Amino acid sequence: MNNINTTLIEGRKSHSKFHISLKNVDKNYGDKKILDDVNLSIKKGEFVTLLGPSGSGKTTILRLIGGFEWTTRGEILFDGLDIKDLSPHKRETSTIFQDYALFQHLSVTGNIKYGLKLKRYPKDPSSIDPGIYKNLEKKKKEWEKFAKSKMKQLDKTQEEYEKILKSKNLSRGKRQKYQSWLDDSDFKYSYWETYVVNKVEQFEKHHLTRKITKDEINEEITKMIKLVGLEGSENKKISELSGGMKQRVALARSLVIEPEILLLDEPLSALDAKIRTKMQRLLIELQKKIGITFIFVTHDQDEALELSDRIAVIRDGKIEQFDTPKQIYDYPINKWVANFIGEANFFDVRFVEKNKALLLGKHIPTIHTEFEEGQKLDGLIRPEDIDISLEKGHFEGVVEKIIYKGSYYFISVNVEGKIIEVETNDYFEVGKKVWITWDLDALHLMAKDHKGFMANDF
């Protein structure tokens, strides 16, 4: 049986190809800009991770989507409809916070049951008076007419205020008043744009749905307990559970209300390594099984690479790159992203001609053709893409340090004063002369990142 929220949301949907879109979103706290012109579009059923260091703005984006914060400017669209004026409980989202926010006085079952109190199911069509639908169509026309009149009134007021602001004789107080109204006009328009849809939802909820029964509640709880692996813990108190089990309860409580979008704010950060790995696998399994959109916040690069369909890498309130894990890891847009997303060797490079780059004094073949001759670039080669041997290669160097990592060795090679890191299965003694080389496509060239960064950014 379908959740009524899923049924009602159909009335909101347009033909947008994206489930969620943020368009030109700014967020300010006083004079401090937290988000700067953020544009992000997420498809239905995607697992998207917002990845960035502390203070980058990733959690703010999540809170804007969930309705816990308001944008300063810009649009937040669900299926093409601007919903930034909607309160959290009216959005098709459920949120798992970093501390899980579980009810300590309730059992596992009690926590999962909590969200079901407001859940409603569609009534049996045969029990509904056909006149209800005629009445709904009549009211829709009335609501549409009313909303249009309000929109026209807003247009007129906006035009009037914009004209007034052009006057040079306007006092400072009045100028601020009119400008403040214009700055907030986005929210005023958004309210009336969604007015009809909201009225229809209220009508349908009252006339076309019913409360969920006790048996249905128990059925939903049993299904969810099985889904997240909580069998045998139904009656336990929250204080009796491990971190991993608490996380499962939080997942069950969020998923039982059948949201279209699950928002996860660093939910695994407090778990130890083994439990964290198990929960990562569970998240992937659940997302594929139920098929809803997951938006996951983390500062852990490995976690983002393992979980995501796509990753938005965020820096100082801006999205630096939004792409698949493979594209971001292999083809980062700049040095900052490359350094943040994994181990890397960087080189100062000059593009000398088509398919050639000057690196450490040598002309090295490259697959790149898009840069201008003489252009200064950043070069990237991942440690695992470098071959080390005793046979002649691109550069000769000396092994300075070797670290055993279990399944491989991490070796530091000194090449004319430049330390190059290499991952290899072969052992080389410290002080040994070696040669390093790499495949043609291992060298990735990027335009210089003039913004720069400090080591403590990571």
From Swiss-Prot:
InterPro entries: AAA+_ATPase, ABC_SmlMolc_Importer, ABC_transporter-like_ATP-bd, ABC_transporter-like_CS, Mo/tungstate-bd_C_term_dom, P-loop_NTPase, Transp-assoc_OB_typ2. It is an enzyme of class 7 (translocase). Gene3D superfamilies: 2.40.50.100, P-loop containing nucleotide triphosphate hydrolases. One of its GO terms (molecular function) is ABC-type polyamine transporter activity. ATP binds at G52, P53, S54, G55, S56, G57, K58, T59. It holds the Pfam family TOBE_2. It catalyses: ATP + H2O + polyamine-[polyamine-binding protein]Side 1 = ADP + phosphate + polyamineSide 2 + [polyamine-binding protein]Side 1. PROSITE patterns: ABC_TRANSPORTER_1, ABC_TRANSPORTER_2, POTA. Keywords: ATP-binding, Cell membrane, Membrane, Nucleotide-binding, Translocase, Transport. Part of the ABC transporter complex PotABCD involved in spermidine/putrescine import. Responsible for energy coupling to the transport system. PANTHER family: SPERMIDINE/PUTRESCINE IMPORT ATP-BINDING PROTEIN POTA, SPERMIDINE_PUTRESCINE IMPORT ATP-BINDING PROTEIN POTA. This is Spermidine/putrescine import ATP-binding protein PotA. The lineage of its organism: Bacteria, Bacillati, Mycoplasmatota, Mycoplasmoidales, Metamycoplasmataceae.
